[in-house]
Design a protein with these regions (language model features):
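N-terminal "arm"/small-domain region of PLP-dependent enzymes with the aminotransferase-like
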Residues: 1-59, 67
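Conserved PLP-enzyme active-site core in the AAT-like
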Residues: 7-16, 78-311
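Short loop segments at secondary-structure junctions
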Residues: 32, 223-226, 348-353
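Conserved N-terminal alpha-helix of the aminotransferase class I/II PLP-enzyme fold
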Residues: 37-89, 111-119
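Glycine-centered tight turns that cap/initiate beta-strands
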Residues: 74, 314-317, 402
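PLP-dependent enzyme catalytic core of the Aspartate aminotransferase-like
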Residues: 117, 126-127, 141, 145-148, ...
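Short hydrophobic/aromatic beta-strand micro-patches
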Residues: 221, 345-347, 407-409
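Conserved small-domain helix->loop->beta segment predominantly found in fold-type I
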Residues: 272-275, 279-281, 286-290, 295-297, ...
Length: 428
């Protein structure tokens, strides 16, 4: 559906039914698949034929939805994972091994910060975190001979910093490595990182893509633009024979358009099994079909709430890149001219105690670890999503102890503002 608009792709990309076939994508609720001969199945295990042999690796329902997300992001191949964290781990681990090094923005989701700084460190993979506001010189200084990937979030959770995608892509490519961008918050409706130089895009589909808090999942999209063979010395996993698949070399057999996702699916899914269930993929697709209609409402509500909070005397500061006073406003206008997302973070005067009292008195907004839902929700990141960080790391990530993150849903903005106003009135 290359010639159609993004709005149409949200509804129809990824699945084209034949004569007499289901109009909605079918849920293939089966762990395995039948073949007439051992030879037919053997070709699948040798990656000599396309098809399905076990849902731990692939499933038709998942592939329909992955194809839609690839079309929305402008990529050549995509896959679904069991969660956004699985997507980020697979995207990095697919090209990193013991001794590898990652350059990452310091302003990212706490779980991803922990994944890179702690869990992957136990695997022998080191990382250098840089401020998204760093100069080009500071960014380039973070690389070393073992750097294999650069990672950042389009809009960081929860500090709402905006990644200068072109700056990070330029540095990554100058050092012969890909840029991986988590595009969860804006979704491809509001930003397509591949168009700005990103090579791999990840998503927590649990958030705006599903949009209803119904299905946990993740996705990885490959732009098909990074030339792995041109940097074969850095990526032996893609550019040298894989003994677990009879000596296949992914970059040679599948080219730069298909090597990354094929290896990720056939090797990492086989060994680690972080597959999204077909039922969750089906639910995700229902969310995707209305994504282009829902996202503007989230942005409208986020903008209205941010403007209200910015003027309130009990609010210390507001993070929202749609505000003209925000330091990321110009970057947001460049990369997301139609708006970013419905998530706003702000600090109430009085610190953590005031923040907790404010949240306790909200009526519409529930305290949840979730974000990007049809229903408005909030939390204090320092005591929840980012509680594994120490005070220094919190400040580096732009997360003071009294910060409140509010995810504006699809309710009427006047009701949301009234709820915020009455809750703020309870804070002395």
């Amino acid at each position: 559906m290359k010639d159609y608009t993004l709005n149409t792709k949200c509804v129809q990309a990824g699945y084209t039914p034949g004569n007499g076939e289901p109009r909605q994508i079918p849920i293939v609720q089966s762990t395995t698949f039948k073949y007439d001969t051992s030879e037919d199945m053997g070709k699948l295990f040798d990656l000599e034929a396309s098809g399905y042999f076990y849902t731990r690796l692939q499933n038709p329902t998942n592939d329909y939805v992955a194809a839609k997300i690839a079309a929305l992001e402008g990529g050549t191949a995509a896959m679904l994972t069991s969660s956004g964290q699985a997507a980020n781990f697979f995207a990095l681990f697919n090209i990193c091994e013991a001794g590898s090094h990652i350059v990452a923005s310091s302003s990212i989701y706490g779980g991803t910060f922990n994944l890179i700084s702690v869990t992957m460190a136990k695997m022998g993979i080191s990382a250098t975190f840089v401020s998204p506001d760093c100069t080009e010189e500071e960014l380039n200084a973070a690389f070393n001979e073992n750097t294999r990937a650069v990672f950042g979030e389009t809009i960081a959770n929860p500090a709402l910093t905006v990644l200068d995608i072109e700056k990070f892509a330029k540095a990554a490519h100058a050092h012969g490595v890909p840029l991986i961008v988590d595009n969860t918050f804006p979704t491809p409706v509001n930003c397509r990182p591949i168009e700005w130089g990103a090579d791999i895009v990840t998503h927590s589909t649990t958030k705006y893509m599903d949009g209803h808090g119904a299905a946990v999942g993740g996705a990885i999209v490959d732009s098909g633009k990074f030339d792995w063979m041109a940097h074969a010395d850095k990526y032996p996993g893609l550019c040298t024979p894989d003994e677990s698949y009879h000596g296949i070399t992914y970059a040679e057999k599948f080219g730069k358009e298909g090597a990354f996702i094929t290896k990720c699916t056939s090797q990492l899914m086989r060994d680690l099994g972080c597959i999204q269930s077909p039922q969750h993929a089906f639910i995700l697709n229902l969310g995707l079909e209305s994504r282009q209609v829902r996202m503007p409402r989230h942005v409208e509500n986020g903008q209205a709430v941010a403007e209200f909070l910015e003027k309130h005397p009990k609010v210390e500061f507001v993070n929202y890149p749609g505000l003209k006073s925000n330091k990321y406003y110009e970057l947001a206008q460049k990369y997301m001219p139609n708006g970013g997302c419905g998530v706003v973070s702000f600090e109430i005067r009085g610190g953590r105690e005031a923040a907790e009292k404010f949240m306790k008195n909200l009526k519409l907004a529930a305290i949840e670890t979730h974000v990007a839902d049809a229903r408005t929700c909030c939390l204090n990141p320092a005591t929840s999503t980012h509680r594994q960080m120490n005070d220094e790391q919190l400040l580096e990530a732009g997360i003071p102890a009294g910060l409140v993150r509010i995810s504006c849903g699809l309710e009427d903005k006047t009701d949301l503002i009234a709820d915020l106003e009455q809750a703020l009135a309870t804070v002395s």
